[in-house]
């Protein structure tokens, strides 16, 4: 099991051809460092694909996700901007649901 204590989403798109080293360099450029037990999420320009980089304290994990239909609800592109997500928001995001409306405990936080 990979321990994840915090989840960060980058608003600027990333080329999905990026491998582990390129994705790690992008995390460092956007977030300043790859902190242990943190997940960093990136999407392509069309928000149809997503990559997640996790530093588990010993090494780096890189996972990719693509939806069969639709696209991810990604925030607008803002230079150097990042957003912290909770577990419920991440679960909604990876399913292609509007994660901005999901709050902890299933509460609705935005109409």
Predicted regions and their residues:
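Polybasic/polar functional segments that serve as interface/processing modules
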Residues: 1-111
